[in-house]
Amino acid sequence: MSFEVGTRCWYPHKELGWIGAEVIKNEFNDGKYHLELQLEDDEIVSVDTKDLNNDKDQSLPLLRNPPILEATEDLTSLSYLNEPAVLHAIKQRYSQLNIYTYSGIVLIATNPFDRVDQLYTQDMIQAYAGKRRGELEPHLFAIAEEAYRLMKNDKQNQTIVVSGESGAGKTVSAKYIMRYFASVEEENSATVQHQVEMSETEQKILATNPIMEAFGNAKTTRNDNSSRFGKYLEILFDKDTSIIGARIRTYLLERSRLVYQPPIERNYHIFYQLMAGLPAQTKEELHLTDASDYFYMNQGGDTKINGIDDAKEYKITVDALTLVGITKETQHQIFKILAALLHIGNIEIKKTRNDASLSADEPNLKLACELLGIDAYNFAKWVTKKQIITRSEKIVSNLNYSQALVAKDSVAKFIYSALFDWLVENINTVLCNPAVNDQISSFIGVLDIYGFEHFEKNSFEQFCINYANEKLQQEFNQHVFKLEQEEYVKEEIEWSFIEFNDNQPCIDLIENKLGILSLLDEESRLPAGSDESWTQKLYQTLDKSPTNKVFSKPRFGQTKFIVSHYALDVAYDVEGFIEKNRDTVSDGHLEVLKASTNETLINILEGLEKAAKKLEEAKKLELEQAGSKKPGPIRTVNRKPTLGSMFKQSLIELMNTINSTNVHYIRCIKPNADKEAWQFDNLMVLSQLRACGVLETIRISCAGFPSRWTFEEFVLRYYILIPHEQWDLIFKKKETTEEDIISVVKMILDATVKDKSKYQIGNTKIFFKAGMLAYLEKLRSNKMHNSIVMIQKKIRAKYYRKQYLQISQAIKYLQNNIKGFIIRQRVNDEMKVNCATLLQAAYRGHSIRANVFSVLRTITNLQKKIRKELKQRQLKQEHEYNAAVTIQSKVRTFEPRSRFLRTKKDTVVVQSLIRRRAAQRKLKQLKADAKSVNHLKEVSYKLENKVIELTQNLASKVKENKEMTERIKELQVQVEESAKLQETLENMKKEHLIDIDNQKSKDMELQKTIENNLQSTEQTLKDAQLELEDMVKQHDELKEESKKQLEELEQTKKTLVEYQTLNGDLQNEVKSLKEEIARLQTAMSLGTVTTSVLPQTPLKDVMGGGASNFNNMMLENSDLSPNDLNLKSRSTPSSGNNHIDSLSVDRENGVNATQINEELYRLLEDTEILNQEITEGLLKGFEVPDAGVAIQLSKRDVVYPARILIIVLSEMWRFGLTKQSESFLAQVLTTIQKVVTQLKGNDLIPSGVFWLANVRELYSFVVFALNSILTEETFKNGMTDEEYKEYVSLVTELKDDFEALSYNIYNIWLKKLQKQLQKKAINAVVISESLPGFSAGETSGFLNKIFANTEEYTMDDILTFFNSIYWCMKSFHIENEVFHAVVTTLLNYVDAICFNELIMKRNFLSWKRGLQLNYNVTRLEEWCKTHGLTDGTECLQHLIQTAKLLQVRKYTIEDIDILRGICYSLTPAQLQKLISQYQVADYESPIPQEILRYVADIVKKEAALSSSGNDSKGHEHSSSIFITPETGPFTDPFSLIKTRKFDQVEAYIPAWLSLPSTKRIVDLVAQQVVQDGH
């Protein structure tokens, strides 16, 4: 051992067991080593020893492991495997809320005394499903999974042994193991989210837990739910490894608890559950009141358990009993028996001097006997009397008071024990009936048995419990030793025999022929047998060699004996051994019970007799086999088996079962006696580690090679211990073989370990002796320290050299600057002289130039003024000339304009007079015509002619329109020519202006003449105004007369308008019909039929009931010619032939309409052929059109199946084929859902979107149809009210069906998308390293080809997946809201599953992985933004914040507080899990323990706050570390948006579809639509 100064070690401590210490002095004087240790509490301790390497020297401290290993998940990986190291590792993990730790093959489970439901969720079950032990952190489920996989793969039965002292958590652990087996899935579907629903068998198996706990568990000083019996549950599997049943074996029920409970303890839970949960009427029937009123329930004091609702537990127990097949009547009978037991406990026996008496009229006795259905007198008799049967007679004697009490309690214990066994037998009958028994292929047994017990007073129960633990410990030691041997043989290494403590002498002491149990049975069979006489026999027989090594008697007293168990010596008090071992009830009481009228009690007693007969037969068989080996007479004596012998026999059977299976061990530890949450008592845990054999396991491991490393792990960790020339090549090699790695391993070992016995190289691993890893770690630490020092030295040398060079350069630079300054000063002086000379020359030149420029400016100004004066004179002359021209032009135009206005006015007056005379004549004529009766006929005739004339005019107008179009073109040409002419005119205008200027002078002369004429004209104008006033008066008079005549004319017109309106309506109808004929004939030539939205009249003569026609659609079949549709080719009729064509169509209608309807009815009625064609040809034989970035699909290419179905459905409704339509639709709905269910692979996305679009189309049609029925009165025509209601009901039901179909296929499709995405997401988001230069290095590059798995998916695959969804939805016309719902759901799913995977991967929680994760998630965010999903980032918050957590500092409390603010979406439990599992790189400092404890304390406080309901902030608290992914059922996003508009339907049948009947239906519908149009 190395105890250099600074070495960390462990020193014994009275209160803590062990305390950390550090060597502060190591001196060697006088042949002795003197060590001084500084303990963690600052105490200084001195140690003197002669040899520091003497492992057996108890005074030496034990070496401590490096900090990185102190909280290891497997204790066998500790460098120093010693008691304090194991204790400290468990304590460190416990303080970080990790209750599970491996110790080789053993799982150590430390009871948290707190609710940790998050550790046992369905998500956690699925996380461990299919994983090898060691892949994830230690857990109960890892052991269960290992057992399940070994059973499945090796076809070998398994056993899980759960042991520990009372209150350690055995029962809970066993319960969760059972839940795991009932919930785990197959390996190939282990990654799929498990459905919560379990099979009925699995539910029944889990239901056994509350039953067994109610009848077999009780509150003790150490545990509120202590199992007072042992249980071995066999979970049975068939050949397909499916759970088919279970079997339960129980061991040593603590019968004495029924009649006696120590202070603060309780009786079995079932009694308190009855008091709290039974209805008042039932309690009255059973004469029950309160728990405190019954002696069997009130001895312990408080009858309540904090945090437990007995009424709620009662309901759980009753439900479980019902589930396992125990009827309500039988349950009532059981409750009557339990109530009777309580009344028996209250029976008051009267005490006399020598005996006891009990009256048959005692109230409690009467109640008990009434409930049990037995005779009260006989029962009371045998309570106070006993009967001894001799060969010749029966002797009845009285019992004293204490014996009577024992007799009374014995009956109660007998009945309760029999009831417990009967319950177990009934459960086994239900869970393992003959049909199940025939299918059993393998089983997994879960043994929940008491741990080693030692109290101040240890009795028969403790003796049996410790005996069982001795047997289990022996098997455990042998199993561990066997596994060690198998590992060494498998790896082909040299090894020597490992010695371990064998407890066989202790077992022989108990179970040999003259052992404790044998002597106990012998004494129990004697009528006068007593505890004292049995004790003397023990002393005489066993307190001598060789048994005195494990047996001894106490120094004082004769009422105890001491057994040296493997854990420690236990002193047993002999009081009550004989009575408990006998476990008998008097024959008199037995006869009384057998005469009961309670059927359930009779069944219980019969079951007891059957069990006794089986035991006797087994003993007879054993004796016969023994007799065959030893000849001689065989004498059999019928003896009632004792409790000890039965327990021994069942224990032997149990050990045989365990030895025939592969065993797994779970050791439960109780961390403190006060049951305080998360409190750790070192001494208490240490005693349990010794008692449960964990330290013995470690000792066995230490004797061999406890530390094992794979070649890869060893090379990656310790390659730096050899010169880089030896390992440099292996890193650079492209192809690295295993031989290369092993050669590096050998070079490392040769360079570091001189003693070859300290290690062995196996086939796949390197095995090290204890302490070697610490030695290698120290070498590695020293090497890294030296390397760091060397690096620092080089860096510092470079730094100071750089500083020297900078100073030297600065000095040179300063010198250069000074020299430069002096030279510049001298040059400056010279330059100043030169500048002065230059300034003088410049000044003189400037003065001369200024004089010259002044003279030049004066001359220039004089010239400017002269030129200005000349120009102003010229402009004035021009202005006067222009004014004269303007005046001349005005004067010349005045006289001709005045003359024109007078002439125009006169003309208007003359026209008005002439028109008045004409109107008067017309009015007289109209009055005459109005009186004529024949005038109307003539008007009508003229109007008809006018219609014809207008029709001809319309044609001429069309012709004129064409001519006008041509005329426009000609005009456009003319416009262009006009533009050219305009240019010419502009030129001419300029020339004309010149002429005008010449003319101005002439006009000035005429101006004066015009002014004179103007005055005379004004006088003439005044005369004309007077004349105009006279004419206005005459006009007003004519106007009044005209009004009267117009009123008469208006009356005449009204009559005319009525006729015109009637005639116009008729003409419009004729015109619209002609246009319809023309349109239909045109459409027929194109293969298209369009019908109006309004329905047709129902076919009452064909239909069974009234129905409305939904044949309001446009049928288009681009692949069918007019001949295929059986339509005669017609040209579009001209206006002149309209009447003739319409008449011909009318004649054909009567002939063909009936034939078409009959054929349609025949095709639609035969649903078998139609259904087969639609389902197989259309629905199953569908083809999805290609969708992509550049592909634009029309709606008919996408929803053609829906359009075809709508046509067929519409025609069925038209003919009243409601039953056929229901059958047809049922087949359609089932087929579509089945098609979507079978989608997989690359077809999943496009085909799923395709069917979503079609189902939406169908649903929209049905909604449109329903709305039309309810809102339009025309649909009621031809139907009775009942038929109408029936029809509304049919369509409403169909709407619900299509709504359900949309919901179902959306959920099926989305779940399939999630399943497909799950395969890619974890690899792409979590595992792939897309960011170059930041490889996390979980595996080295040069070993990847040998050990690492290649990545299957990258982020490109994820983005391709989402792109495929986007383009398919866009191409198939899916609403944007649906796309948004689908993608956000998938993003949330990716966030959840990736986070759940990441939080369970310890080696992925590093800062480099944080960078990679951040990069991958950022790519998803960018995709969301580019596709309009602004809230996509919110769906990935857990991954985003986890990436941040892995990259930021976590070394101070302030860092943690900041981190909590950043990672607001993560719960405290998730933060604690991530931080505690953070993988520290070699160049990082480990996260301090106080920080880990601080984070754990936050979780504890949050949990306490949540459980107490005092969360003032209202925050939701979740202790689960997993995010529950949303796996359905999902809300159908289509239900949240409006249905599609449905004006017309376009049915498109692709050419590749083979649908002859469907095409014929479309053909006939087309013909009918054409005829209906005519």
Curated annotation (Swiss-Prot):
Q: Which residues carry this modification: Phosphothreonine?
A: T1097
Upon changing P1529S, the result is:
In MYO2-573; causes a mitochondria inheritance defect
Domain notes per entry: The myosin motor domain binds to actin. The IQ domains provide the interaction surface for the myosin light chain MLC1.
Tell me which InterPro entries the record gives. Dilute_dom, Fungal_Myo2/2A_CBD, IQ_motif_EF-hand-BS, Kinesin_motor_dom_sf, Myosin_head_motor_dom-like, Myosin_N, MYSc_Myo5, P-loop_NTPase
Effect of substituting V1288G? In MYO2-573; causes a mitochondria inheritance defect
Boundaries of every Myosin motor domain copy: 70-781
Assembly behavior: Homodimer. Interacts with calmodulin (CMD1) and the myosin light chain MLC1 through its IQ repeats. Binds to the membrane receptors SEC4 and VAC17 to transport secretory vesicles and the vacuole, respectively. Binds to KAR9, which transports BIM1-coated cytoplasmic microtubules that are attached to the spindle pole body into the emerging bud, thereby correctly orienting the mitotic spindle. Interacts with YPT11 and MMR1 to accelerate mitochondrial distribution to the bud. Interacts with SHE4 and localizes it to the bud tip. Interacts with RHO3 and SMY1, putative regulators of MYO2 function.
Q: What is the effect of changing L1474S?
A: In MYO2-338; abolishes interaction with YPT11
Q: What is the effect of changing E1546G?
A: In MYO2-573; causes a mitochondria inheritance defect
- Myosin N-terminal SH3-like domain location, by residue? 4-57
The gene it comes from is MYO2
Q: GO terms for biological process? A: actin filament organization; establishment of mitotic spindle orientation; Golgi inheritance; intracellular distribution of mitochondria; membrane addition at site of cytokinesis; mitochondrion inheritance; peroxisome inheritance; protein transport
Start and end residues of each Dilute domain: 1226-1501
The cellular location(s) given in this protein's UniProt record come to:
Bud neck; Bud tip
Principal subcellular localization:
other
Q: Coiled coil where?
A: 933-1088
Question: How changing E511K affects the protein?
Answer: In MYO2-66; disrupts actin binding
Give the SUPFAM superfamilies listed for this entry: Myosin S1 fragment, N-terminal domain, P-loop containing nucleoside triphosphate hydrolases
Q: What is this protein called?
A: Myosin-2
Q: What else is known?
A: Present with 4339 molecules/cell in log phase SD medium.
A GO CC annotation recorded here is: meiotic nuclear membrane microtubule tethering complex
Task: Report the source organism.
Answer: Saccharomyces cerevisiae (strain ATCC 204508 / S288c) (Baker's yeast)
Q: What is the effect of changing K1559R?
A: In MYO2-573; causes a mitochondria inheritance defect
Q: Where is the IQ domain?
A: 784-806, 807-831, 832-855, 856-879, 880-902, 903-932
Q: Spell out the family assignment given in the record's similarity comment.
A: Belongs to the TRAFAC class myosin-kinesin ATPase superfamily. Myosin family.
